[in-house]
Amino acid sequence: MEKWVIAAKRADFNQIGQQFHIDPVIARLIRNRDVIGEDKIREYLSGTVQELPSPWLMKDMEKAVDILEKKISQKAKVRIIGDYDIDGVTSTYILMKGLARIGADVDTYIPDRVADGYGIHAHLIERAETDRIDTIVTCDNGIAAAAEIQMAKDKGMTVIITDHHEVPYREEKGERQMVLPPADAILNPKQYDCPYPNKNLCGAVVAFKYIAALYERFGVPAEELEDYYELAAIATVGDVMDLQGENRILVKEGLCRLKNTKNQGLQELIRANSLEDAKITAYHIGFVLGPCINASGRLDTAARSLALLNAKTKEEAARLAGDLTALNQSRKALTEKGKEEAIRIIEATELKNDRVLVVYLPDCHESLAGIIAGRIREKYHRPAFVLTGGETSAKGSGRSIESYSMYEELVKCADLMIQFGGHPMAAGLSIEEKNIEEFRRRLNVNCMLTDEELRPKIVIDVPMPVSYITKELVEQISLLEPFGKGNTKPVFAQKNLRVLDHSIIGKNKNVVKLKLLDPQGISVEGIYFGEAEDFVNFIREKDSISVTYYPEINRFRGRESLQIIIQNYC
C-alpha cells in the first residue's frame, strides 16, 4: 500500500511569488525541489547556457587539451571508443564531429554489446595497435578499465578518458582511496579532487565540455557549439541524470533547438515517430526518441544509431530512422515477455520474500536486462537485478530505489563478479553462473533497507482544490519544465471528489474519462491512464474518492478546457 505524504518545506511563498511574479503555488513547487535563495531561484526560472561553469574547471582539462593539440599538430591517428547506449552514441558523435572540426585524424569504434561487451577490452587495444592508432579517447567508459589502459600504455599509446561513472575505490583505514587507471588524462567530475561543481553530468556532457575547451584553444567560434546542445539534452534525459542546475539548463536549451534541428537523422527520427507537429518534451526523449536510439545497441549494432546522426541525405536518414523505430517496437515486445517471465519466477519462488531481487533469465536478450530490472523495481519497489545467459558467463543490470546505493553494495560483493560498474541508482555486471545464488544471498544479507524504505511513497507537492486551477496557473507550471528525475512533474491532491460520470475510452480500453465534482460544487473533467477496469470497479464502490493529479489545458478542435490527469487514487 502506498503512503501519501505532503512535502512540508517552508518558505515565504507569497514574498517569493511577488519578487519573481509567480503564483505562490509555483513558489512552493520550486521550494519543494530544494531550489533555495534568490540566485538559485532566478537560475531555475531563467538560467541560460552562457552562465554554465567553464570546462576548464574540470580536473585534467588543461592536460587533455594540451595532449590533443600536440597530437593534431603531429597528424597522429586518434580513435574514439564509445559505448552502445544513448549516452555512449551521442558522446561518440560529439567527440567525432568536434575533433574532426579542429583537424584531427579521427575514427570511432562503438563496442558491440554481445561480441565486445561494455567498455575497453584487450582485443580492442590489440585492434588499435594493428590499425596504428596513436591515441585513444574514451567516452562514457574507461574509468574502471585500469588493466586495459595499462595494456595500451605498454604498447606506447596515449589514452584520454572521458567518463562519468563512479570512480573505483578501495577502503583503507576507513577512508576511500580512488583507484584510477593509468591514463594520460582523465576527465570525470566524480574524481574526488575534481573542482567541477556538477558531479552529475552524463558522458555526453563531459565530451561536450572537452570539445568546448578544444574549440576555445583552436579559436573555433563559440556559436558552433550550439549544435551540440540538443545532443547533450538527449543524453542527459536518456541516461536519466538529475534535471537540476546545469543539467536542467542544458536540457531546456536542447529541447528548444531539437524542434528545429539541422541534424537530418534527428529530423527523420522525429518524423518517423509522428512528432513533427508536437512540442517535444523530456518525455518524448525518455520514452519515444531515446528508446529508438538505444534500440540499435540493444538488438543490433549501435553503429546504426551513430550512422543516423551522421546521415548526409534525407533518404539515408529516413531509412535509418524507420529501421530504428521498427527495432524499438521489437524491443518493446521482447521486454514485455521478459518482464512477465521475471514476475512469474518471483511469485513462484522464495524470491518474493527478498529485499533485493536477483532474477536469472538465461534465455533473455542481455540488452533488455536493464529495462526489465527497471520494470521489476517499479512493480515491487525494491532494488532489482536481472541477469541473462552468455557464452562464458551471465551478464546483467540492476536498477535501484533512492535508499539503496547499488554501486556501493556491489563493491561489497566484488569477489563474486568478473566485472561491474555503475551508479547509486543503476549498475551493470558480469558473473559466473555458479556464483549467482551466492550473489543473491549476500546482497540480501548485507541489505539494511527497512520496511518503511521499501514502502512506496507518493509525495504530494500541494493539497489543492481543483477550484483553484486556472489557465494562468497551468501556464506558469510550464516554467518548471523540463520534468524528469530530480525535477519531477508536480503532484497535487484533493480529497472527497464525487464521480458524476465515467467512461472507458481508447483503442486499448486503458483510459477512463470522468466528470468530477468537488465539495464546493465545482466540476472538472478528469482523465486516468492505466488499469481502467480496476479504477472503474473502485469508483463504483465509493461515494467519493481522493486523488493525486496534474492539471493541464485540453485543446480540442479549437476549444480549450481545464482537466486533471489522475495519477493515484484511494
Listing of model-derived features with the role each one plays in the protein:
Residues 1-3, 479:
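Catalytic domains of riboflavin
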Residues 70-74, 316-360, 412-570:
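Mid-to-C-terminal polyanion-binding domains and interfaces
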Residues 164-165, 365, 423, 511:
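Histidine-centered active-site/metal-ligand motif
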